[in-house]
Amino acid sequence: MQHPVSEPNLPVSEACLRNQAPIADVLAQELEADAFVLEIGSGTGQHAAYMTRHLPGIKWQPSELAGRLEGINGWRQRSAQVGFLPPLILDVSQDLWP
């Protein structure tokens, strides 16, 4: 498990560190190489950074509540992966989605 030692201001989820590799293994088997993934409730943004690094052909669309995008944007900037798209503001409790 790698912690962002060079970027101490990025949020880190220990659960994400534990599960990102097994999730990537399953996604690699199940998704087309150029799949589009909408992640609902992206949290820290770690999954998006990890998945776009390990599955370089995919487009990963993170989403999160307004006010919780800073960490996702930080991970996006750090990862510099083309497939890591800018996060959408999404509240699944609302009737209207972007």
Task: Mark where each language-model region is.
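Short glycine/proline-enriched coil/turn segments at helix->beta-strand junctions
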Residues: 32-34, 56-57
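Short alpha-helical
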Residues: 18, 46, 67
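Class I SAM-dependent methyltransferase SAM/SAH-binding core
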Residues: 49-95
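Short secondary-structure capping/turn segments at boundaries of alpha-helices and beta-strands
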Residues: 26-27, 47-49
